[in-house]
Design a protein with these regions (language model features):
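Beta-strand-rich extracellular modules
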Residues: 171-173, 328-330, 447, 524-526
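Active-site pocket scaffolds in enzymes
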Residues: 73-78, 130-132, 138-143, 147, ...
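Hydrophobic h-region of N-terminal signal peptides that target proteins for export
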Residues: 25-30
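Short, surface-exposed loop/turn segments at beta-strand-coil junctions that are enriched for proline
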Residues: 158-162, 313-319, 512-516
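Exposed beta-strand face motif in extracellular beta-rich ectodomains
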Residues: 164-166, 321-323, 519
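Histidine-centered copper-binding motifs that mark active-site loops
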Residues: 3-10, 19-23, 34-313, 333, ...
Length: 544
């Protein structure tokens, strides 16, 4: 099959093993194709036909196809892009981002039943994952339900999530990184009556910001990777940051309050977001919606896949002034391979490609993200309530039914592993099976890899569930790895992705409600995910 529009010099795991001189015999743990156990890539397409019992409130047509957009002056950039239209429901359900390769914003309401007619017009297979939404097994975009190029799939689900900032992207195993990089991503915003009653900034006062880093060649085409073997182990990094698919973005705003919906849509880059004038960052929401009370942070740490809702109050700014949203510098050590294998390859300003030009900036390099220009005077009466939302009081450790389920981050066979295992399409281990309606404490343990010298942070994502972060414990020997980012964590909110630093053990509380079936948990560093740092977990009905 033809690959993507970017110049892909990125090493896949099999290539990396060969480079390391280990041969293909060590590659038995990962599959390079998305097949079901019987080897039929088109098997498991139940979404081709609509369910007769499902009556949608909203119906959408969504297509993934090659396209070309103006990102830089000169030649158009070849991308892959989602496009959409409303078949049934409010016209406002689909909102395109003009001049962007990003998919349309999909606006839904809690309680709506949604049908999405998805058409794959790409030159390769794909799926659509509704990141953060609680949906049935066959509707979650698992690579078992791969959609071959030229074919279609019907996704049907009820929106049972609370209001919040979610998103959608592909989930083709070992191709998620390049497919997202080539442009396949979009925001999905859910509203509900409780949030609407708060009177938060909306309409023109609601601003979406999807942060992604990219590298372009001299002809304005995307470059995915440098071909360096450590890149697969560390994750892809570009040499510039785009907001909503645009370079050097700026906004002309007024002296009033705005709501910024932020998504880190990068493959592996972590952002340390702060206002240029030192004003604290006011956070009102995380992955799964509004916090109970707002948080004020000196900066906001946003790992790949994470979202945050931020209030920007410009009421005290003078007309004619400007404000920068920046990503501050932080040490790159927790995001680079150790053991002498490439450590320092990306230290400092970045890494040089085969042509001698800089192809990336290190994780932790400072960036100017967005320039805000205050150009007019307006008054607004937005007052944030003391209580933004109320969380279920039963979400406490004491409500869990069993001991902690420990899930370890490990490095072996020249790849990142979860519990010593790599991804297998249909495989679920005994300790990856949970009971429907169970409340469990899961512990993501990243201490062992750190002890081995593999001191990398991992943003770990759980499909189909929102969770609460209960606790972080860090080995004092590795505490400095996270010190420069720790004040920006937003563990107080509902999460589906959490950054686990080297030497750290993070405990989360999860309630496995509503749907049985097989779902994924994985690292949301997309290169790690594609190399096999992903596993299934299965939710089963209780006996009797």
């Amino acid at each position: 099959m033809k690959r993507g529009p970017s110049h892909e010099r990125h090493m896949r795991r099999r290539d990396f093993l060969t480079w390391m001189g280990m041969g293909l015999a060590g590659a038995t743990g990962a599959s390079s194709r998305c097949q079901t156990r019987n080897g039929d890539e088109t098997a498991g397409l139940p979404g081709r036909d609509t369910a007769s019992s499902f009556t949608p409130d909203v119906e959408i047509a969504l297509t993934a196809a090659p396209s070309a957009v103006q990102i830089l002056p000169g030649a158009l950039t070849q991308v892959w892009a989602y496009s959409g239209s409303v078949v049934k429901g409010p016209p406002s359900t689909i909102q395109s981002l003009a001049g962007s390769y990003l998919g349309p914003i999909i606006r839904l309401q809690t309680g709506q039943k949604v049908r999405v007619h998805f058409a794959n017009q790409l030159p390769e297979h794909t799926t659509v994952h509704w990141h953060g939404l609680h949906v049935p097994e066959r509707m979650d975009g698992h690579p078992r339900f791969i959609i071959p190029n030229g074919q279609s799939y019907v996704y049907e689900f009820e929106v049972i999530n609370r209001a919040g900032t979610y998103w959608y992207h592909p989930h083709h195993h070992d191709r998620t990184g390049p497919q997202v990089y080539n442009g396949l991503a979009g925001l999905l915003l859910v509203s509900d009556p409780k949030e609407a009653a708060l009177g938060l900034p909306s309409g023109a006062q609601e601003i979406v910001c999807v942060l992604q880093d990219r590298t372009f060649d001299a002809d304005n085409q995307l470059v995915y990777g440098s071909g360096m073997p450590m890149e697969s182990m560390n994750g892809f990094l570009g040499d510039r940051v785009l907001v909503n698919g645009q370079t050097q973005p700026s906004l002309s705003l007024a002296t009033r309050a705005y709501r910024l919906r932020l998504l880190n849509g990068s493959n592996s880059r972590v952002y340390k977001l702060a206002w240029g004038d030192g004003t604290p960052v006011t956070v009102i929401g995380t992955d799964g919606g509004l916090l109970e009370q707002l948080l004020r942070r000196p900066y906001l740490t946003l790992a790949p896949g994470e979202r945050a809702d931020v209030i920007l109050d410009l009421s005290q700014h003078r007309v004619g002034t400007s404000l920068q949203l920046r990503s501050l510098a932080f040490p790159s050590a927790p995001f680079e391979m150790g053991m002498g294998m490439g450590r320092g390859m990306r230290r400092g300003i970045g890494r040089m490609g085969g042509t001698g030009r800089q192809t990336s900036a290190a994780n932790g390099a400072p960036f100017s993200i967005l320039t805000i220009r205050v150009q007019r005077r307006e008054t607004s009466n937005v007052e944030l309530p003391a209580t933004l939302s109320t969380f279920d009081a039963s979400w406490h450790r004491e409500q869990t039914e069993q001991s902690v389920r420990r899930l370890t981050v490990q490095f072996g066979r020249m790849q990142w592993l979860l519990n010593g295992r790599t991804f297998e399409m249909d495989d679920v281990a005994a300790n990856e099976t949970v009971s429907l309606d169970a409340k469990e404490v899961w512990e993501f343990d990243n201490s062992g890899a750190a002890m081995m010298g593999m001191r990398l942070a991992h943003p770990l994502h759980l499909h189909g569930r929102q969770f609460r972060v209960l606790d972080r414990q860090v080995d004092p020997r590795f505490a400095k790895d996270g010190d420069s980012l720790r004040e920006g964590f937003t563990d107080e909110g509902w999460k589906d992705t959490v950054l686990v630093m080297p030497g750290e053990r993070v405990q989360i509380l999860v309630h496995f409600t509503r749907y049985t079936g097989m779902f994924l948990y994985h690292c949301h560093n997309l290169e790690h995910e594609d190399m096999g740092m992903m596993r299934n977990y299965r939710v089963v009905a209780r006996a009797g």
